[in-house]
Amino acid sequence: MNIETLFPLDPNVKVRTRFAPSPTGYLHVGGARTALYSWLYAKHFNGEFVLRIEDTDLERSTPEATAAILEGMEWLNLAWEHGPYYQTKRFDRYNQVIDQMIEQGLAYRCYCSKERLENLRHEQEANKEKPRYDRHCLAHHDQPTDAPHVVRFKNPQEGSVVFDDAVRGRIEISNSELDDLIIRRTDGSPTYNFCVVVDDWDMGITHVVRGEDHINNTPRQINILKALGAPIPTYAHVSMINGDDGQKLSKRHGAVSVMQYRDDGYLPEALINYLVRLGWGHGDQEIFSREEMIELFDIHSVSKSASAFNTDKLQWLNQHYMRSLPAEHVAKYLAWHMNDQAIDTSNGPALEEIIPVLSERAKTLKELAAASRYFYQEFDGYDEKAAAKNFKAEAVAPLAKLLEKLTALTDWSVEAIHDAMNATAADLEIGMGKVGMPFRLAVTGSGQSPSMDITAKLVGRERTLARIQKAIEFIQAQA
């Protein structure tokens, strides 16, 4: 039987991996980690990474889910050399191989009704036997080929399937445990396990990294590959990801969709760094650049044990990258959140200017965007608790004096604003807090902000002066 390549298989490429999600939902963090491990392993060996969309489940697969998967992969910057390929566009190829297998005696048509199969299963269970097909149709060829039927793979009945899993070590399954797998349904559509095999063969996949839930599929797929005379990839089955409570990660633990993490304000660098450490590590190192991941990652070093997702750790990493990545880079992602929160940044400081100022306090870009609103927009009122403490009648004098000094400035710089604050405190013989706290509340509407000299510089001269005047009038009106 002949291979049908989808792209030139470069003989110099020693490692070719694939990520093959089913478009029945969003790209979740477990799938993203699998994609990352596959991508890193290929890059480590200067190999190739293939993206394949396994959309044979026609009832559950949707274009929206496909788009969400592609969007998630692009956001994570996991670029593929080949693809995306869609299984639904390759049905002719799968059926061609199935027909050849029937001709060569590697597969056979099965005409058994649902009733017969149900009766067979009940009989085997009553005899405490493992339910399996009895190969009734292998010995009976008296049915016309156009009668309703499925096609079954003729699985070996003797021996075992043995493979060395890159994560779990040697795995052996007796062929007596395996049934004659249906590879084509009554409606003529090929089944998942068969499509996967043909795809891996045609795409020259050398290493299959996937979740541990696929372990039971592997011996079936290996037997089909052997029947086709195709090379057997190296398999690596990674463990599941649990929540903080040890239960399987789910929606009740918070975000599980990759794009939900985007929406919640995480940088792709932070999520990638966090995911790579969920089951793999290099000593005590926590922070990895993408280049370091490629250099150091080894699928054989991935843990067999389930990993626990820790949101606090992810937030710590996110804050690290918000502070350490170039502000110009972070600004590209922050802009999305500013737009999402309806903050018009056209009249205010550049995003690159506010990022280093606000990233010390914010854990996510979503928080940073919300905290930056006063740089670009007017606010309706003041924080009640802060106003009760800092907008008493005696705050009018320092605000008025500061307004006078700031108005006189010809240089609207951090240093000049800082000097004006000091001079106000000195002139009135009061502590800096008596100047700074009312000033902060007047300009930001909040009792918390970065240093006020920097804040006022970024808010701008006109806005700052107008807000101080407005605060004075507010306090006087309350008196």
Swiss-Prot record:
Q: Which Gene3D superfamilies match?
A: 1.10.10.350, HUPs
Keyword presence, ATP-binding: yes
Judged by the first EC level, this protein's enzyme class is: ligase
The chemistry this enzyme catalyses reads:
tRNA(Glu) + L-glutamate + ATP = L-glutamyl-tRNA(Glu) + AMP + diphosphate
Instruction: Name the InterPro entries for this protein.
Output: aa-tRNA-synth_I_cd-bd, aa-tRNA-synth_I_codon-bd_sub2, aa-tRNA-synth_I_CS, aa_tRNA-synth_I_cd-bd_sf, Glu-tRNA-ligase_bac/mito, Glu/Gln-tRNA-synth, Glu/Gln-tRNA-synth_Ib_cat-dom, GluQ/Sye
What cellular component GO annotations does this protein have? Answer: cytosol
Family in the record:
Belongs to the class-I aminoacyl-tRNA synthetase family. Glutamate--tRNA ligase type 1 subfamily.
Q: What is this protein called?
A: Glutamate--tRNA ligase
Species in which this protein is naturally found = Actinobacillus pleuropneumoniae serotype 3 (strain JL03)
Lineage at the top is: Bacteria, Pseudomonadati, Pseudomonadota, Gammaproteobacteria, Pasteurellales
